[in-house]
Amino acid sequence: MEVSNLSGATPGIAFPPGPESCSDSPSSGRSMGSTPGGLILSGREPPFSAFTVLVVTLLVLLIAATFLWNLLVLVTILRVRAFHRVPHNLVASTAVSDVLVAALVMPLSLVSELSAGRRWQLGRSLCHVWISFDVLCCTASIWNVAAIALDRYWTITRHLQYTLRTRRRASALMIAITWALSALIALAPLLFGWGEAYDARLQRCQVSQEPSYAVFSTCGAFYVPLAVVLFVYWKIYKAAKFRFGRRRRAVVPLPATTQAKEAPQESETVFTARCRATVAFQTSGDSWREQKEKRAAMMVGILIGVFVLCWIPFFLTELVSPLCACSLPPIWKSIFLWLGYSNSFFNPLIYTAFNKNYNNAFKSLFTKQR
């Protein structure tokens, strides 16, 4: 297969033309999780340029950090009894999906990036397994973020009705729906003959390019959960704004008055001065709950913001590319894909940074190991 250099001044990094261009094929857009065009070694250039080594090193570090950090969170939740409850089961579900992304999806994606001509040489069966896990794990990771956002929303806005028993049932149901829906999206091509992932002639492994499946997979894996998390955070913002206004109205001013009374048995007048004051009806429990709600709202906001920044470039490309006669450089497709993968690295950093119990549990875990 003919390859072309990224630029004349950058040896060792090349990209194949053809199927990746929108103008070459009406269904050239790559569906969620498919093999990207990206960093591959040119047969006519030195096999290991400095830029290639740098990129590979960074991606290997990203894979290792994503795997180890999520594994640490998962082990902590399993070993610490205090974490055997909501919302830590949702965090555990997210950690499982992100561990699988780092262990099964990202390494083979890196191998595919570095293969000359992006040819898949591991066979049809392994191709189907890889693509299925790619779609399954990335979709589950995205929907788990939506589930965490929903749980925080109900906790903040309905803390009286959202009892511990209700919360357990809701979280278990959300986890079940997350993995069932992710499995349906991932296995639909195999179960219903919805396109083929492996092309033996071209030795190409990618998600089914069937246009109807592309719409189904991208909507189910990203656009629907995106709508959910944006709606949830808007409702959280409105609820926080309403509560702040209600607390301000709860501050009661007392007017300043002066009264004069005759002492019944004394020949003097007693003056009583009532000074102007404000009384806010707020207990220490309300203050603690308010601080907890603020941390939860901030955590959800950052989690959603990072989720959108990581995934929206990739999925916007997947939506626009099949509809226009344009050609996005393969290097950008790779950048957008790995930016999406990096969301699995940021997830545990965010939800542990806002919970001191995780930091204490990490310290305790390493102390016991010593």
From Swiss-Prot:
Keywords: Cell membrane, Disulfide bond, G-protein coupled receptor, Glycoprotein, Membrane, Receptor, Transducer, Transmembrane, Transmembrane helix
Protein residues bound to serotonin: 134
Transmembrane segments: 49-75, 89-115, 128-150, 169-189, 212-233, 301-325, 328-352
PROSITE patterns: G_PROTEIN_RECEP_F1_1 (PS00237), G_PROTEIN_RECEP_F1_2 (PS50262)
Subcellular compartments: Cell membrane
CDD domains reported for this sequence: 7tmA_5-HT5
Region span, Disordered: 1-36
Bias (Low complexity) ranges: 20-36
Membrane topology: Multi-pass membrane protein
UniProt cross-references to SMART domains, sorted A to Z: 7TM_GPCR_Srsx
GO annotation, biological process: adenylate cyclase-inhibiting serotonin receptor signaling pathway; chemical synaptic transmission; G protein-coupled receptor signaling pathway, coupled to cyclic nucleotide second messenger
Glycosylation sites (chain numbering): 5
Keyword Membrane annotated: yes
Main location: membrane
Cellular component annotations (GO), alphabetically ordered: dendrite; plasma membrane; synapse
Tissue-wise expression: Brain; in the CA1 region of hippocampus, the medial habenula, and raphe nuclei.
UniProt topological domain (Cytoplasmic) ranges: 76-88, 151-168, 234-300, 353-370
Cystine crosslinks: 127-205
Extracellular-side segments: 1-48, 116-127, 190-211, 326-327
Known role: G-protein coupled receptor for 5-hydroxytryptamine (serotonin), a biogenic hormone that functions as a neurotransmitter, a hormone and a mitogen. Also functions as a receptor for ergot alkaloid derivatives and other psychoactive substances. Ligand binding causes a conformation change that triggers signaling via guanine nucleotide-binding proteins (G proteins) and modulates the activity of downstream effectors.
Entry similarity comment: Belongs to the G-protein coupled receptor 1 family.
Protein name: 5-hydroxytryptamine receptor 5B
